[in-house]
Amino acid sequence: MPLNVSFASRNYDLDYDSVQPYFYCDEEENFYQQQQQSELQPPAPSEDIWKKFELLPTPPLSPSRRSGLCSPSYVAVASFSPRGDDDGGGGSFSTADQLEMVTELLGGDMVNQSFICDPDDETFIKNIIIQDCMWSGFSAAAKLVSEKLASYQAARKDSGSPSPARGHSGCSTSSLYLQDLSAAASECIDPSVVFPYPLNDGSSPKPCASPDSTAFSPSSDSLLSSTESSPRASPEPLALHEETPPTTSSDSEEDQEDEEEIDVVSVEKRQPPTKRSESGSPSAGGHSKPPHSPLVLKRCHVSTHQHNYAAPPSTRKDYPAAKRAKLDSGRVLKQISNNRKCASPRSSDTEENDKRRTHNVLERQRRNELKRSFFALRDQIPELENNEKAPKVVILKKATAYILSVQAEEQKLISEKDLLRKRREQLKHKLEQLRNSCA
């Protein structure tokens, strides 16, 4: 009985070891934070049990679009065919072992395509994008390719190069599986439907490796060394250049009109001549990219000495202090509005905001001027001269009455003046008569 228990526990340990890479074993979660913070009680024995049931989230893999000699199944059979001394004297692995080997290599579809076919192939690029577009960028794909290539190269060095006869026999034994895989690959969606715009126009598809060549040809060795040495150099042919729209004739005319009044400082953003020559090379399909127009940043310098249309034309008069302050404020306000119009983009929203702001400033200034005029009128009325809280209606009524009384007094004084003038004329005439009589 104890032997059976120990055997069962040993089997459980082996099962756990076989699926251990799919569990989280790096980080420990705090299920009992209070106990761990107090550190008075040891952790419960059931804390680490639930971690055995946490599986790693794996992204879905797209099926291979390559068929024939470039398919991963051909790589699985041709590159990793077993030797006679590995399976205990048999000539080859069993059908289950071959299926497991093909399935394992299908997971690294991107790796198999990378060292069997040329990376400049358009189908290879689109296949990588379909597999990797919703998880990470091309740098992550290049890193994954370099890591898996290194592991497969080490495995091939340990196992040795297979003989072509055994590879051919392995290919014939697994023909049923290859037919199923090629049928699944033919049902895959064409990447050109999903990505209508080709990523590198200058790259032309190259043929795959011939069946007579070995799994690792010189081109694949050079690809492996270049991938391991410079992982950042791989995304360069896939770089998408940001294009700016070309300048039209209307834009150039507007720029010429603006140059008459403002100072334009242009900053051009140009690409290096090497990249432009590479991008300007003729493509295989005959498509050419539009020329990159320079990005121009403009900065306006508005002159402060502008013509004020509200000012008098030629004659210079001495205005009172209130009138002079009003004219100066009008000039400043006009300059501020001109600066805002030049600095802000020409859109309807900004123009409406500027008009509203200008109207508010002018209205506030008009009210202040009206208030000051009322205060000046109040100071001229004797009855309201010392009344600072007099309302505007009272000021207007008292001012009207005071004006009428002043006008009546003016008429009275004018009549008195006329009477005095007549009296003076009479006295002058009488004095003239007396002088004549005395003489």
Curated annotation (Swiss-Prot):
Biased amino acid composition, Polar residues: 335-347
Residue list for modification Phosphoserine: S6, S62, S71, S81, S151, S159, S161, S293, S314, S329, S344, S347, S348
Organism: Tupaia glis
Bias type Low complexity, positions: 210-237
InterPro entries per UniProt: bHLH_dom (IPR011598), HLH_DNA-bd_sf (IPR036638), Myc-LZ (IPR003327), Myc_transcription_factors (IPR050433), Tscrpt_reg_Myc (IPR002418), Tscrpt_reg_Myc_N (IPR012682)
Function: Transcription factor that binds DNA in a non-specific manner, yet also specifically recognizes the core sequence 5'-CAC[GA]TG-3'. Activates the transcription of growth-related genes. Binds to the VEGFA promoter, promoting VEGFA production and subsequent sprouting angiogenesis. Regulator of somatic reprogramming, controls self-renewal of embryonic stem cells. Functions with TAF6L to activate target gene expression through RNA polymerase II pause release.
Protein name (record): Myc proto-oncogene protein
Single GO molecular function: protein-containing complex binding
CDD domains referenced in this protein's UniProt entry, alphabetically: bHLHzip_c-Myc
Region span, Disordered: 203-359
Compartments where found: Nucleus, Nucleoplasm; Nucleus, Nucleolus; Nucleus; Cytoplasm
Region annotation (Leucine-zipper) ranges: 413-434
Position of sequence motif UBR5-degron: 355-364
The entry's keywords: Acetylation, Activator, Chromosome, Cytoplasm, DNA-binding, Glycoprotein, Isopeptide bond, Nucleus, Phosphoprotein, Proto-oncogene, Transcription, Transcription regulation, Ubl conjugation
Assembly description: Efficient DNA binding requires dimerization with another bHLH protein. Binds DNA as a heterodimer with MAX. Interacts with TAF1C and SPAG9. Interacts with PARP10. Interacts with KDM5A and KDM5B. Interacts (when phosphorylated at Thr-58 and Ser-62) with FBXW7. Interacts with PIM2. Interacts with RIOX1. The heterodimer MYC:MAX interacts with ABI1; the interaction may enhance MYC:MAX transcriptional activity. Interacts with TRIM6. Interacts with NPM1; the binary complex is recruited to the promoter of MYC target genes and enhances their transcription.
Domain of life (superkingdom): Eukaryota
Chain positions with Phosphothreonine modification: T58, T315
UniProt xrefs under PANTHER family: MYC PROTO-ONCOGENE
Glycan-carrying positions: T58
Motif window: 9aaTAD: 100-108
